[in-house]
A protein has these predicted regions:
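Alpha/beta enzyme core
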Residues: 2-7, 13-43, 64-70, 83-139, ...
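A mid-to-C-terminal "edge-of-domain" accessory segment
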Residues: 4-11, 250, 254-421, 461-468
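Non-catalytic terminal/interface segments that mediate subunit docking, oligomerization
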Residues: 17-18, 22, 27-31, 36, ...
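N-terminal active-site wall of soluble small-molecule enzyme domains
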Residues: 50-70, 75-78, 82-87
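Short beta-alpha connecting loops at secondary-structure transitions
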Residues: 109, 175, 228-236, 248-260, ...
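Catalytic alpha/beta core domains of metabolic enzymes, predominantly
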Residues: 177-180, 184-305, 309-311
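Mixed-charge, glycine-accented linear interaction segment located at domain edges/termini
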Residues: 479-513
Length: 513
């Protein structure tokens, strides 16, 4: 039985080296809490020493929280071989574990430091002992280790020989430039495990050749004890190994345990996405918006017949649900799945007509979503216009320089009219505040959580171009999207919101007005 693989998340240190990404102290503490308390990663790396006063304050806040929770030994920070300057900086911030950065290749040692390997080894040993004297635990990075193993393995062995008896908890082996493939990764890692069976090794992947996850798995297969990841694959250049994919591969393909709570992965990924402003690609495994969406009708049909198109990556594992897209490759099965979710039942002839219309609209490059189905049904079956339970009677939005925007809303819900006025940080925010007041104060009902808000405008630069707003909502643990289209962005958002209201009001018939 293999021991659990240690997952060290370096989103707050290496992930912050992504171009355009910078976390403030509050965001760092929030992410640290999610990683340790919800995801249950083994360790986190939260900062580099000597960056700024603000960074030191962030380290102090996390260190104080971690100490109070009993997590102090699971919070680490990067330090340098600089005669104790980094150690003083981290010690002042309350950090108890330092990840010292040594050179893992002869080229880096001689070319960047202008040191002989022997002198560098002396400096590293002195820094390790200085950290221990300060009561700190030490891990050691061998920067550019992958190129060291490729071009100067004798240098790597000399470093490890000289430090094997030093008080180092883990030797951390980075593929700093992302040059390894899984075959070399496994070969180099196994070499170290066999040469130094008493030492603990971590592998730190970079994704320049899109091999970070494969290399991470190869390192564990070779016997490494821990791996480094980041949420959403953040990191220098092409990024690091994404936590979501690395954990899934270790669990499913290698049969290893990590202690990670998979059901929290999606939530943590979305939180980090909101802090960084870097969108998760829709097709990113595990956490992308489209990865649990079946588009082909044959897949939806197979899922209805003993789950023929399922694999081990079930969406429920990651706190998500399977969806079925509507488009020109959709068959009757996709339409049926969406109608079932809406609680609508059609006969065979009606189903065929609706499916044909969905394909026709998709051929015209029109996007069809589940909330459009009632309107499509009304059109193709010549029903009266859909009797929507929610109608906007009128509203007023005001915007003045130096003042908060104000919205006055009058809305009809199941025949009852309600009116509210509210200020907000923007016109749509004011509209939503007024709407929430109606739901919570007058209806006494919960209101969906707005999870995501995206706006797209066709290329061309015209000020009168149509704006498409897609809003993701969450209610009762279920996420769904609505879409609005208008030349005005706020109007588009309001249209998407009204569609959401008509979806949630299906289950209500009378407000008692």
């Amino acid at each position: 039985m293999f021991p659990p693989v240690e997952i060290m998340d370096t989103t707050l240190r290496d992930g912050e080296q992504t171009s355009g990404v910078s976390f403030n102290a509050r965001e760092k503490l929030s992410i640290a809490r999610l990683l340790l308390e919800e995801l249950h990663v083994s360790r986190i790396e939260i900062a580099s020493a000597r960056v700024s006063q603000g960074e030191q304050q962030a380290v102090r806040a996390i260190a104080e929280w971690a100490a109070a929770k009993g997590y102090a030994d699971r919070v680490e920070a990067l330090g340098f071989i600089d005669g104790g300057v980094s150690l003083d900086w981290l010690g002042t911030a309350g950090c108890r574990v330092v990840n010292l950065l040594a050179k893992g290749s002869r080229k880096h040692c001689e070319g960047q430091l202008r040191r002989t390997p022997e002198r560098h080894l002396e400096d590293v040993r002195a820094e390790i002992l200085a950290a221990v004297d300060r009561g700190m635990k030490v891990n050691l990075y061998l920067e550019d280790w992958s190129n060291g193993m490729r071009r100067s393995p004798d240098y790597v062995y000399a470093m490890l020989d000289g430090l094997a008896d030093a008080p180092v908890s883990r030797f951390m082996c980075p593929d700093t430039l992302g040059v390894l493939d899984p075959y070399d990764t496994e070969r180099f890692c196994r070499d170290l495990v066999e040469r130094y069976p008493s030492l603990r090794f971590d592998f730190h992947a970079h994704n320049d050749y899109d091999l970070a996850v494969a290399n991470t798995a190869a390192a564990v297969r070779a016997g490494f004890h821990g791996v480094h990841v980041t949420v959403n694959g953040l990191g220098e250049r092409a990024g690091n190994a994404p936590l979501s994919s690395a954990v899934a591969v270790l669990h499913d393909r290698l049969g290893r345990t990590t202690g990670i709570d998979e059901t929290k992965i999606n939530r943590v990924s979305r939180t980090v996405e909101s802090y960084t402003g870097i969108r998760i690609p829709a097709n990113r495994p595990i956490v992308g918006a489209s990865v649990f969406t079946q588009c082909a009708g044959i897949h939806a049909d197979g899922d209805s017949k003993n789950n023929l198109y399922f694999n081990e990556l079930l969406p429920e594992r990651f706190g998500r649900v399977r969806e079925y897209a509507l488009g020109k490759t959709s068959g009757k099965a996709n339409v049926l799945k969406n109608l079932e979710a809406l609680g609508i039942d059609l006969d065979e002839a009606a189903m065929r007509k609706v499916t044909e219309r969905v394909v026709e609209l998709s051929d015209k490059k029109e996007q069809v979503t589940a909330e459009d189905l009632p309107y499509i049904i009304a059109d193709v079956l010549r029903y009266d216009p859909v009797d929507t339970p929610v109608r906007i009677l009128n509203y007023s939005l005001s915007l003045a320089q130096g003042m908060h925007p104000v919205a006055t809303l009058r809305i009809e819900i199941h025949g009852c009219a309600y009116e509210r006025t509210s200020a907000g940080d923007g016109q749509y925010d004011a509209f939503m505040r007024a709407l929430r007041q109606i739901y919570r104060e007058q209806l006494g009902r919960e209101f969906p959580m707005l999870r995501d808000y995206t706006v797209s405008i066709p290329p061309g630069g015209r000020t009168d171009a149509f704006v498409q707003t897609i809003i993701t909502w969450e209610m009762d643990g279920r996420e769904f999207k609505t879409r609005g289209l208008d030349a005005d962005q706020t109007e588009a958002a309001i249209k998407a919101t009204v569609k959401m209201l008509n979806i949630i009001e299906i289950n209500y018939t009378d407000n008692g007005c």
